[in-house]
Structure formats: structure tokens, C-alpha cells
């Protein structure tokens, strides 16, 4: 098998970065296919902690080709800061990073309009301009990476967009307008620094696959934040599910061999939106502290709750997972009783399928099965047989309920704190 897609199976923050980092050792290419700098992938190598927002996690390995695909919306300023930080730490960027020509760019007016609209309609965005950038993409008004190399095209697009945006900022939001010349100068400066990375990414990826290279597709956020299949409107602005790897990188579904769902051993969510299994007492706070559940991008505390099999069954269905990776199992060490949601109570009915109506989901109560916890530490365990019996029972229940095999179990933050039951590559 030469290709694998890594997908978050919950509301993001499942620990995808570590799994991608681990699997990259066996890969030749790592491709980011959607999202923007609203994602934060944390990877710990030795004593060094890296937080990556745009560049694929594979960049931390030598001689791995990392590609930012056309499905990503890219903030040039954020990317340059990330490149600078990694370079200062001795990471080689120049020969290993490629950016799709038709990747869309986040502009200052995207950030400005999102900041203003979020004041009126609170969804819980990161205020990074992600949504407005995708809006321009769909409306066919977007600025793309390749436009940086054509100053007249860039100037005309900025001017046309500012006519609308400045009108809204001034008349609807009573906010400061933006200067066309200032933005153009800023982005032409970015062009000089980034032009060496611009490439026909889809051609590179397909040639790599066709020649037998191993390619890993790295998703951002999670299934329940998908624009179509998530808890709309409390979602991100892109397709976070496995199908997004094909559209966001330019590859055929026939070229995808494995799809791995990343599942945190409990559930977290950042920002607004329904969360049926949320733990609102001191245990929720304890899990947050143990797991370091604070956003890598915003620093916002994550809401914590029990594992939700209803949401996970939905994720299995829309992604077609061939395997699962369970993360943060060690965070549950020492908790006397564990709960797993197996259904939702809605009125007099028990729902086994994830509701598409947000108003129904908001009124759902979780139906739990309880499990005896384990007192022994699982931290750093690398052999499945050495896990406590109750931890194995917990994992077996997940596997049996979802009818998908668990291939990987993460038992800590560090790269080598991991159990491989079966390699997806």
C-alpha cells in the first residue's frame, strides 16, 4: 500500500500531528489538503516541541517532500513565520516544501471582515480569515498563489475585492477601511519570499504515486467540523473528511489505499456548538489539565467529554475508515469509572445515528455504558500486551462497536510513545 489519508474522527484536536509524524518515517511525501492556519498540529521530538499550522508535520523528517495542496487557504505571513521558526531550529525547508499554484491566499480583508461578523454572530471562529477566504474561493473572487507572480492580476483582484469589502466595513460595521496600495506592496513582498515554493502540486503528487512512492495525506480539524457533514453551522469552511483529500490535492479516489481515523480516547471540542457528552463537573476540568487541552492555535480551553460512539459511527460511515488510531489513552489512567456514549435519548426515542438537525442534537441526552477504569499507568507503553486488562477491554469495545480495527495506540506525547498493532503503510 502506497497511500494513506489521516482524518480526525471527532471535532479536531485528536492528535493527528503525532500520528502523521510517526508514519512519515515510512513515507516519501506528506500532503496537507484542506484548512488553514486555524489548525495546530503539535509534535514532540525528543525534548523539542513543535506546533505546525500550515506546513505538513513531515517537515520534521529529513528528505521528506511536503506539499501544501490546492484545498488549503494560506496566510503568507503565518507561513513565513513558520518557515523562520523551523529554520532557526535547524529544519531544512527550501528543498522540501512545495505549494500548489492554485492554493488560495488569505488576505487582510478576510481577517477584517471575519472579526466584524463574529461580533454579530458568534460561531467560535479563530478569526484567521479562513471562512471569508473560502467564501471568495466559491464566489470566484479569490486570490491564488500563482497570482503573486503576476502583479497586474494581483492588483486588479485586490482592487475589485476592496470595493466591496471597504463598503461593508464602512457602512455596515462602522470600521476602518483598508488601503489597496498597502496590501499590494505587502503581497508583492511575500511573492519574492515564497515564489521558490510554488509548484504544480497535483502533478508532483500523481507522479509520486504512479512511481511507487509512499504518500501520506494529512487532514486538519475533524469530521464533525466538516462543512457538509459536521454540526453545521458550528463547523469549519472546508471538507475535512477523506473525500477532501482527493479534491484538495488533485488525486483520484482510486489512488487512495488506506484511510485512518484518529480517535481521542475521550472527546473534546473548541468553541460553540452542541456537545452531548460534555463533562461539566470537576472531572472535565481534571481531564483538561491532564491532557493539556488548550488550543494549539488560539490557546482556548477545550471542552472535554466522554467518548461518543454515535458521532464516531457517523465518522466511520462518511470516511470509510480502514483503520483507527486511538490517542491520549494515558490521560484516562486512574479514573475509576469510564463512560462511553452508545446512543442519544431524544424525547421518547433512542437515536443510534448522528442527527443532521442542530436543534435535535442540542436536545439529545447521552445514553452511556460504564466501564471499570484502570489504576495502572499506560504512559509510554509500546507493547499492546502490557496494557492493563481494563484498558484492553475499553479498546476492544470501541473496535467492536465501530467494526473497524485499531491499528495504532498513542500512550504519550513523545514520538516513540506508541503501540503499533498493524502498520497502515
UniProtKB/Swiss-Prot annotation:
GO terms for molecular function: adenylosuccinate synthase activity; GTP binding; magnesium ion binding. It is found in: Cytoplasm. It comes from the Bacteria. GO terms for biological process: 'de novo' AMP biosynthetic process; IMP metabolic process. Substrate binds at residues 296-302. Its cofactor is Mg(2+). It is an enzyme of class 6 (ligase). Binds 1 Mg(2+) ion per subunit. Pathway: Purine metabolism; AMP biosynthesis via de novo pathway; AMP from IMP: step 1/2. The keyword Ligase applies. PROSITE patterns: ADENYLOSUCCIN_SYN_1, ADENYLOSUCCIN_SYN_2. Mg(2+) binds at residues 13, 40. SUPFAM superfamilies: P-loop containing nucleoside triphosphate hydrolases. Keywords: Cytoplasm, GTP-binding, Ligase, Magnesium, Metal-binding, Nucleotide-binding, Purine biosynthesis. It catalyses: IMP + L-aspartate + GTP = N(6)-(1,2-dicarboxyethyl)-AMP + GDP + phosphate + 2 H(+). GTP binds at residues 12-18, 40-42, 302, 328-330, 410-412. Its main location: cytoplasm. The keyword Nucleotide-binding applies. Homodimer. Plays an important role in the de novo pathway of purine nucleotide biosynthesis. Catalyzes the first committed step in the biosynthesis of AMP from IMP. Belongs to the adenylosuccinate synthetase family. PANTHER family: ADENYLOSUCCINATE SYNTHETASE (PTHR11846:SF0). This is Adenylosuccinate synthetase. It comes from Thermodesulfovibrio yellowstonii (strain ATCC 51303 / DSM 11347 / YP87). The lineage of its organism: Bacteria, Pseudomonadati, Nitrospirota, Thermodesulfovibrionia, Thermodesulfovibrionales.
